[in-house]
């Protein structure tokens, strides 16, 4: 409530706390998402979530475009299919018009740089463990783990921002992601390693969702079943996948990046799914 906090910024806040004898102002440092520049900050609340004390701040924002999916499909807005990748590629995006024509493709890279930076920090942690034994697991390495945390946050914000800006530049109204089974996602992430490009996919998606919402772009999930099995160019079955080059080839001989193929199919399925619903609604009406 007003009077119980003051000087709230992205990184600090002062809270009025009861010590048991008197009220005092306590200076606190904050870690987490940046507050939106155009947002109106509401009264924060302190919530304890073991082992952290969290400051939750409601934000009131004006959304540029509050229309729903049906309205955007009816208005023939562009759709962007996004598939997360591995190695150097964080994500691949394919932009389609309402009639299914591809107008733009982009690979969002930087995964190798992210992995290398994380690995250098992990090497420091391992050396500290070897030098300090049990003590190396405590405060000695706290600053290194904070570096890992900051790297995760930095790259997740950077890639999510790049995707949203790319979609804005291509007048995208809907961003579609393939939705996989939770067990499958865990298996793939475990196989890719702790500090791979795919390791950040969940956080990138989280940051991207609210950034897109602020820009008037909807983010939705599309059932991923079978998206990787067919060629996005001709619809033929995929018959081979080269995991070294990440290329896939269909029965008709079309060869393309397998993540791009899935991104294209995701955008296509999104269009087909909601255009079908639109036609059914018009027929019923």
Predicted features along the sequence, with ranges:
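Acidic carboxylate diad motif detector
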Residues: 1-52
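Positively charged, helix-rich recognition surfaces that bind polyanionic ligands
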Residues: 53-285
């Amino acid at each position: 409530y007003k009077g119980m906090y003051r000087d709230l910024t992205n990184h600090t806040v002062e809270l009025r706390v009861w010590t048991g004898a008197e009220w005092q102002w306590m200076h606190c440092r904050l870690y987490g998402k940046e507050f939106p520049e155009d947002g109106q900050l509401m009264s924060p609340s302190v919530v304890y979530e073991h082992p952290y004390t969290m400051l939750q701040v409601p934000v009131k924002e004006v959304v540029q475009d509050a229309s729903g999916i049906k309205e955007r499909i009816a208005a023939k807005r562009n759709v962007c299919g996004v598939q997360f990748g591995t190695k150097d590629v964080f994500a691949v995006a394919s932009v389609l018009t309402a009639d299914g024509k591809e107008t733009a493709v982009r690979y969002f890279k930087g995964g190798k740089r992210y992995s290398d930076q994380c690995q250098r920090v992990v090497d420091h942690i391992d050396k500290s463990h070897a030098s300090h034994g049990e003590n190396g697991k405590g405060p000695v390495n706290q600053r290194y783990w904070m570096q890992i945390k900051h790297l995760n946050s930095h790259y997740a914000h950077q890639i999510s921002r790049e995707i949203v800006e790319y979609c804005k530049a291509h007048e995208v109204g809907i961003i579609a992601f393939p939705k996989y089974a939770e067990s499958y996602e865990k298996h793939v992430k475990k196989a890719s390693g702790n500090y791979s490009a795919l390791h950040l996919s969940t956080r990138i998606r989280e940051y991207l969702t609210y950034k897109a919402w602020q820009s008037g772009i909807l983010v939705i999930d599309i059932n991923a079943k079978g998206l990787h099995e067919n060629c996005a160019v001709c619809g033929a079955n995929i018959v081979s996948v080269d995991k070294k080059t990440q290329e896939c080839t269909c029965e008709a001989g079309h060869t393309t990046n397998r993540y791009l193929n899935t991104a294209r199919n995701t955008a296509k399925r999104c269009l087909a799914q909601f255009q079908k619903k639109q036609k059914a609604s018009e027929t019923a009406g």
